Swiss-Prot record:
Its main location: nucleus. One of its GO terms (biological process) is neuron differentiation. The keyword tRNA processing does not apply. Belongs to the engrailed homeobox family. This is Homeobox protein engrailed. Keywords: Developmental protein, DNA-binding, Homeobox, Nucleus. One of its GO terms (cellular component) is nucleus. It comes from Artemia franciscana.
Amino acid sequence: MGSAIFEPGPLSLLNLACSNLTERYDGPSPLSASTPGPSPDRPGSATMSSPLSSPTGISYQSLLSGILPAAMFPYGYPPVGYMYPTGFPTLAAIQSGHLAFRQLVPTLPFNTVKSSEGQVKEVVSTQSQKKPLAFSIDSILRPDFGKETNEVKRRHASPHREEPKKKVQYIEQMKKKEEIKEEARTESRLSSSSKDSVPDNDKINPPLPPEASKWPAWVFCTRYSDRPSSGRSPRCRRMKKDKAITPDEKRPRTAFTAEQLSRLKHEFNENRYLTERRRQDLARELGLHENQIKIWFQNNRAKLKKSSGQKNPLALQLMAQGLYNHSTIPTEDDEDDEISSTSLQARIE
């Protein structure tokens, strides 16, 4: 009750550690020893030249007795993992042997521990200034990413070596185009009857200059090709026939024999419409073409319909409903034509 516990500040503890930690601990740690703690008789054990004391004159034992009773620790030092009070972790660990002085030195490379502060900074700075990976995230996000590689490629590139290859490719392309043109000429000469109708491909499609070898191959298949889709003239044109057909070129009417006509009339009386199988058999028997028999049946149906005057039953049904009425009414012009035709017949007679 009467004695007050002294709690030193952080500044006094720092002075205490800097003034009294003069010797380096080289002995084994109690954690790795088989005995509870280091023995003073053993070589290499930790020994302190003088008891720890603060600049204010208060001994460390007096500071420790008020906060950390000695009865708490069975072996004379705090156990592993013990939570020290605020301000005493470093001093208590050194006093108990858990912490050696070398552990207070910052972890640096082996060759830099013995060097001065300036050399340490220099080594660390050189390690931090190492060249980053070529494809790391930092290098990719840099604004000059890819510039160095492009410059190296430009230096090592040799455009002059590729010129002979391009020349060889151009010569091969020209040979192929000449072969295609020759084939087109022969085809056009064979297809057309007159040589004047064949266009001159050399005039329409002149050979390409040597500069054309700079273009890729697909260009020659589009713009520079001689196909109709390229916008230029085709390889060979088919001459259009004249619309005015002479009478000699008209198809002559089929002259049926008496036997053929009698057989066709007989078949027409039986059935006015022919099936495909029946039409083929009839054409084989009569020695005619199927189209000739088909047209003859169509003409006879039209004649019969015109002579009988009968209308289609479907047309009659629609006319009864008022939906269909194609009946014609004779006009005055038609009557005048009939009168003139009758007068002409009377004069001829």
